[in-house]
């Protein structure tokens, strides 16, 4: 059973529960993604990195995070 202080989102196609009031920055920080090596999409819209601290997560949001890895 999910606690009342959590909301359900989809992260990269998988269901994830996050705290109510969480923002995109807190999610990325919790997942340990380096901001300079990711692209973020929320509900099919690209998110500017400078705005992620202001973007709240809401129930049923679809978040896609792409992590870039260098190689040769």
Spans of features found by a protein language model:
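Ubiquitin-like/PB1-type beta-grasp interaction modules and other compact soluble beta-rich domains
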Residues: 1-71
């Amino acid at each position: 059973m999910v606690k009342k202080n959590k909301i359900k989102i989809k992260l990269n196609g998988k269901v994830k529960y996050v705290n109510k009031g969480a923002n995109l920055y807190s999610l990325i920080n919790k997942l340990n993604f380096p901001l300079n090596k990711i692209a973020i999409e929320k509900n099919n819209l690209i998110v500017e990195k400078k705005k992620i601290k202001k973007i709240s997560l809401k129930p049923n949001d679809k978040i896609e995070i792409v992590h870039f890895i260098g190689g040769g």
